[in-house]
Amino acid sequence: MNVEDEVDLMKKMIIGRKIGMTQVFAEDGAAIPVTAIEVEPSVITQKKTVEKDGYDAIQLGYGRIKQNKATKPLQGHFAKADKGCFRILKEMRCDQIQEYELGQEITLDIFESGEMVDITGTTKGKGFAGVIKRHGFRGGRSSHGSMFHRAPGSIGASAYPSRVFKGKKLPGQMGNKQKTVKNLMIWSLRPERNLILIRGAVPGARNGYLFIKQSAKA
């Protein structure tokens, strides 16, 4: 199977690890902010079929770990591919499942410079936050007899509806949520170092795991 066929079947998705941000310079001298993502080869650890599972999909493993770091059930699961144990597993739908083999490696060669991708990651956790920090509320006056400054104010009426509507913006956990940023451009590929440079910022902290797939709107 050649690379072009593999790209079509894979829908161009791979797993990576965020290294950090830097800048590169365009031909006209403009400084371009980019995010460096380490993309080691992902390994197919499982094949799912319509007959057995109700749909066709492959499971990718990323980030090798020692065997004793995986649970016994996962050790048995990984043994089928015979490529070691992995920290991250990600399932992906595909059309022609018969074209794949257990243990097959997927590399960053499926992408090209200039392509648009959607990147999913886990945002930085900020802990418990109030409505001003979490939702950008304006807050109350600082003086002239104001009785509230950073409080949210009324969250609903008493007699009717006698409840707080779902989705009401309130204080609570900020960050540490899965987020997808769409239509980011691949600035360049560095296969010799297993790196992808993405123009702009991506979700998450350094060393966070990212799922990179072909943009749905490209």
From Swiss-Prot:
Q: What GO molecular function terms would the record report?
A: rRNA binding; structural constituent of ribosome
Which terms under GO biological process does the entry name? translation
GO CC terms for this protein? cytosolic large ribosomal subunit
InterPro entries, per this entry? Ribosomal_uL3, Ribosomal_uL3_bac/org-type, Ribosomal_uL3_CS, Transl_B-barrel_sf
Q: Which domain of life is it from?
A: Bacteria
Coiled coil location: none
Keywords in UniProt for this one?
Ribonucleoprotein, Ribosomal protein, RNA-binding, rRNA-binding
- Which Gene3D superfamilies does the entry link to? 3.30.160.810, Translation factors (2.40.30.10)
Asked if the Swiss-Prot or TrEMBL record annotates the protein with the keyword Ribonucleoprotein, the reply is yes
Pfam families given for it?
A: Ribosomal_L3
Xref: NCBIfam families: L3_bact (TIGR03625)
**Function description:** One of the primary rRNA binding proteins, it binds directly near the 3'-end of the 23S rRNA, where it nucleates assembly of the 50S subunit.
The entry assigns this protein to a family as follows:
Belongs to the universal ribosomal protein uL3 family.
What does the subunit section of this Swiss-Prot or TrEMBL entry state?
A: Part of the 50S ribosomal subunit. Forms a cluster with proteins L14 and L19.
HAMAP family from the UniProt entry: Ribosomal_uL3_B
This protein's name = Large ribosomal subunit protein uL3
From what organism does this protein derive? Syntrophus aciditrophicus (strain SB)
Primary gene name: rplC
